[in-house]
């Protein structure tokens, strides 16, 4: 079994698959370590040789995780970095199949951890794709490159995010992997994680600085892909990240996909919320309610406008630099044109000066060089050189000069197009011009009369007709015919390269303008002016390209007519004839003052070529002036943009940017509001404590009311049963005090009466009466009656002694009266004892009431003091409440003003958005035009490559012709010197005669 690759006509056996290789592959497939060791030690089988399926024993062992077999094969000389058909190494296969032990063995034996397969994926890509965290850790420990891009432009971190492998993402981020890299579709790792629906990976990426607002090529951000999943945790993480981003200065608008996900009436179960504002956690919403929403919104808008200004300033600086670069390029171009014109003037100025000694009849308008018009001289000399060199090449091909490269046509082409000569043509021309000048100088010192230039035919004195016939022939340039188009092609190549550079700069500017970061700035007047300027520049570049194409076509057609005529003249020329020599002598240019080379029908052709050159020169000068005008317009456009930016900055500072004093005042107001809020909370706490104390005191007062006597309570309830005011309490207490005083007075009177009674009863007790208690007034009255009765009895006994019955009755009455008196005295004693008891109880009760009254007075005084403090606190709280109400009204007024300004800002934002959409549409149209122009540019680049090859070939021919030209000049100079001295070889003389004869024909 063998495999042969045929890459040529002969088939060569590249790899021969023998039976030993097959046995080794089968042993590895079975995992037979002993068999693998035996076969590998024989050296008859190669472990890395591929079979017909593109697999080898070494790669199979790595993919199956056979660590022992892998170690044996490595010990027997297996190439550790060999690749299979897919370009995968053993390390790739081990990471694909998630074999960390094999990965460890391969890395220890020196496997290349940064090798890439056909998909440009490294082992770290496949380890991240398979979710093998151990392999990722091993590769990171061996310093594998973390941010390598595969064919899809994805890094290992992006692949791990797409697979939802949070552990691998954590390892890569800890090792320093870049989190905001995007693939070919402009999708970042966060967008891929949201597309997968992995909330854990998204949270990890956001914690490491992932940009939640980045969008892909379709214009969708991470939240758009998260809304297609049902993971609310993922929504919450993204919305919190966007909220933090909005707080940092970028305003968060309502996401367009949220409205489509939620129903217009009320959201369904499991559907995302209607807006990113409502989807935030409740805790975050409560925090936002505590904050001032108007001031926060104003601050966000201010930060957004400030960032727009910064972006506009950066863009203006960039455009200014581009304008400066273009201005410098145009200035260099103008300087090069002037230098080329000066060089042409230096090269051609010697001819009118030399011919001026014989008068101005030699060349009419010979001082045109001093007037800045060398094109007439250049056109005539070009035609003469072409014709004369063709004639010389027909007579003697060996001595045919090829020196047109250092003549004026090459330079006039570059002067016409405003470009300097290529570097490969510059050095050979300088020695040629020096040689010409040396030859001219020798002729001046020898003859003392005329200067003969190799590039132009000059006149001779009348006495030297033969010399004038010899010297009247100037070497022509056969190479001049292809040099003109070649030079023009080289010029077109350079101009196209410059045009390509301009297009690249324009594309870069377009890309910068079309990026989402610049969307906010597209609606400004400055962006509209910049777009209009770019449109003008695009139209001008198209016109310049059309002119260059026209010039190229005209210059490719122009040289064909004179060259064809020259070739026809050369074919008609016969070898030397005496008659032709005589005709040539008659037509000596010095006698008639007409330029050389204007012979016969060729004079009209020379005039035609001259007219074409003049027309092309005028057209190209016009294009040069147009370019200069465009440069001036660009400068004016730059100044106008600077003025607009300054006005925009002033407007933003005037309308959107708050003054420093207002900002400081706003900060102070916020601090004062915070302090007032804290004080209000403290006052609320103090008020609550006072309320509790007042309630306790009210309960104490109610207890006092309950302790008051029933008659006082009845009077209070009768007056105002529901009112328990302090005045009523004071009245009751004063009444109670008065009653207490009256009771004390009554008690004092009773005590006095008691003392009087005791004093009155003490004399009655002395005669032996057994009465212990003092007699009452009735008893005294009875005693008086008894005394009277006794007196009457004595009187009656005295008067009526005889009436015993009446006396017995009277005694009985007396006894009865005595019993009644005793009975009355007993009753009086009992009443006295009861009175003493009552008096003691009244005294004890009065003492208790006195103590209670003292306690009540103390409580009353304390309550009065507390009530005073409460009244002061209530008054202070009312005053502070009034201040807070005034501040709240002021803040409400400011909030209403800010709301009005925010509405104006929203209207302005809507207008800017409309302008932005309009500009985006215009940019899309321009991008389509740019694509078409790029296609044309590709076609032109192909032509440029062809022209470049032709130019290289012509450069080689130019070098050969210059060498021949130098030899011809040296030989020709010697012959001229010999002719001037009066002797010449016969062969040379014959050759010159032949040349003159051909010139006449």
Swiss-Prot record:
Coiled coil start-end: 295-344, 610-696, 733-810, 851-968
Gene Ontology molecular function, alphabetical: actin binding
Disordered: region residues: 256-296, 352-482, 559-601, 879-902
Sequence ranges of the ANK repeats: 53-82, 86-115, 119-148, 152-181, 185-214, 218-247
Keyword Coiled coil: yes
Annotated keywords: ANK repeat, Coiled coil, Repeat
Compositional bias (Acidic residues): 281-295
Protein's name according to its UniProt entry: Ankyrin repeat domain-containing protein 35
Organism: Homo sapiens
């Amino acid at each position: 079994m063998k495999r042969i690759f045929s890459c040529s006509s002969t088939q060569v056996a590249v790899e021969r698959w023998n039976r030993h290789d097959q046995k080794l592959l089968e042993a590895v497939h079975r995992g037979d370590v002993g068999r693998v060791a035996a076969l590998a030690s024989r050296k008859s089988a190669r472990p890395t040789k591929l079979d017909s399926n593109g697999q080898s024993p070494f790669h199979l062992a790595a993919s199956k995780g056979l660590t022992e077999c892998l170690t044996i094969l490595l010990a027997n000389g297996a190439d550790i970095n060999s690749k299979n058909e897919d370009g995968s190494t053993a390390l790739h296969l081990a990471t694909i199949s998630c074999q960390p032990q094999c990965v460890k063995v391969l890395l220890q034996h020196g496997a290349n951890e940064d090798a890439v397969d056909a998909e440009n994926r490294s082992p770290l890509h496949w380890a991240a794709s398979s979710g093998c965290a151990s392999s990722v850790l091993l590769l990171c420990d061996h310093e594998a490159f973390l941010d390598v891009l595969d064919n899809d432009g994805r890094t290992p971190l992006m692949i791990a995010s797409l697979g939802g492998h949070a552990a691998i993402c954590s390892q890569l981020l800890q090792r320093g992997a870049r989190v905001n890299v995007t693939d070919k579709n402009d999708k970042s790792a966060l967008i891929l994680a949201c597309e997968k629906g992995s909330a854990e990976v998204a949270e990890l990426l956001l914690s490491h600085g992932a940009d939640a607002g980045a969008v892909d090529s379709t214009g969708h951000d991470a939240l758009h892909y998260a809304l297609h999943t049902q993971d609310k945790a993922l929504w919450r993480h993204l919305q919190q990240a966007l909220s933090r981003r909005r707080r940092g200065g970028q305003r968060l608008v309502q996401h367009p996909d949220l409205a489509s996900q939620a129903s217009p009436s009320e959201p369904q179960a499991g559907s995302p919320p209607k807006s990113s504002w409502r989807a935030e956690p409740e805790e975050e919403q409560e925090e936002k309610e505590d904050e001032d929403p108007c001031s926060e919104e104003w601050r966000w808008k201010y930060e957004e406008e400030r960032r727009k200004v910064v972006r506009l300033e950066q863009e203006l600086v960039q455009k200014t630099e581009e304008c400066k670069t273009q201005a410098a390029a145009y200035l260099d171009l103008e300087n090069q044109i002037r230098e080329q014109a000066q060089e042409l003037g230096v090269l051609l100025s010697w001819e009118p000066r030399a011919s001026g000694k014989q008068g101005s009849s030699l060349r009419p308008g010979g001082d045109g060089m001093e007037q800045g018009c060398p094109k007439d001289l250049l056109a005539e000399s070009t035609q003469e050189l072409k014709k004369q060199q063709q004639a010389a090449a027909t007579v003697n091909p060996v001595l045919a000069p090829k020196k047109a490269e250092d003549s004026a046509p090459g330079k006039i082409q570059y002067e016409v197009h405003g470009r300097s000569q290529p570097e490969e043509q510059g050095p050979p021309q300088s020695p040629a011009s020096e040689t010409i000048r040396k030859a001219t100088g020798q002729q001046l010192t020898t003859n003392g009369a005329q200067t003969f230039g190799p590039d132009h035919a000059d006149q001779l004195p009348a006495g030297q007709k033969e010399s004038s016939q010899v010297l009247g022939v100037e070497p022509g340039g056969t190479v001049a015919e292809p040099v003109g188009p070649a030079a023009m092609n080289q010029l077109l190549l350079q101009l196209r390269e410059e045009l390509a550079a301009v297009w690249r700069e324009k594309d870069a500017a377009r890309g910068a303008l079309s990026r989402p970061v610049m969307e906010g700035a597209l609606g400004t007047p400055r962006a509209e002016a910049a777009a209009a300027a770019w449109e003008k520049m695009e139209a001008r570049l198209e016109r310049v390209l059309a002119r260059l194409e026209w010039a190229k076509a005209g210059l490719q057609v122009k040289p064909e007519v004179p060259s064809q005529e020259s070739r026809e003249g050369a074919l008609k020329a016969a070898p030397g004839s005496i008659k032709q020599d005589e005709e040539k002598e008659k037509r000596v240019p010095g006698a008639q003052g007409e330029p050389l080379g204007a012979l016969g029908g060729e004079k009209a052709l020379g005039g035609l070529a001259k007219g074409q050159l003049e027309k092309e020169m005028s057209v190209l000068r016009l294009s040069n002036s147009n370019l200069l005008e465009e440069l001036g317009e660009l400068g004016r456009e730059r100044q106008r943009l600077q003025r607009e930016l300054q006005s925009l900055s002033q407007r933003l500072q005037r309308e959107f940017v708050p003054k420093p004093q207002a900002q400081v005042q706003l900060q102070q107001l916020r601090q004062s509001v915070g302090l007032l809020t804290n004080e209000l909370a403290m006052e609320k706490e103090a008020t609550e404590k006072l309320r509790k104390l007042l309630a306790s005191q009210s309960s104490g007062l109610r207890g006092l009311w309950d302790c008051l006597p029933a008659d006082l309570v009845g009077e209070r309830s009768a007056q105002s049963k529901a009112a328990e005011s302090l005045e009523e309490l004071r009245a009751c207490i004063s009444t109670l005090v008065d009653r207490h005083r009256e009771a004390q007075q009554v008690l004092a009177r009773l005590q006095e009466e008691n003392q009087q009674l005791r004093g009155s009863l003490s004399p009655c007790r002395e005669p032996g009466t057994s009465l212990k208690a003092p007699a009452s007034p009735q008893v005294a009255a009875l005693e008086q009656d008894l005394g009277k009765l006794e007196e009457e009895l004595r009187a009656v006994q005295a008067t009526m002694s005889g009436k015993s019955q009446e006396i017995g009755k009277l005694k009985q009455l007396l006894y009865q009266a005595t019993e009644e008196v005793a009975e009355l005295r007993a009753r009086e004693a009992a009443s006295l004892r009861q009175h003493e008891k009552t008096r003691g109880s009244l005294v004890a009760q009065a003492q208790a009431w006195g103590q209670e009254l003292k306690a009540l007075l103390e409580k009353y005084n304390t309550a009065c003091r507390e009530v005073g403090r409460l009244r002061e606190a209530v008054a202070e709280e009312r005053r502070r409440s009034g201040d807070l109400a005034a501040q709240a009204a002021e803040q409400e007024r400011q909030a209403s003003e800010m709301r009005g300004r925010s509405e104006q800002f929203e209207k302005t934002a809507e207008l800017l958005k409309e302008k932005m959409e309009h500009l985006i549409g215009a940019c899309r149209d321009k991008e389509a035009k740019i694509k078409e122009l790029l296609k044309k540019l590709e076609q032109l680049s192909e032509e440029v490559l062809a022209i470049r090859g032709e130019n290289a070939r012509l450069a080689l021919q130019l070098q050969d012709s210059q060498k021949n030209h130098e030899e011809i000049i040296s030989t020709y100079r010697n012959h001229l010197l010999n002719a001037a001295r009066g002797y010449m070889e016969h062969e040379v003389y014959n050759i010159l005669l032949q040349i003159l004869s051909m010139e006449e024909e």
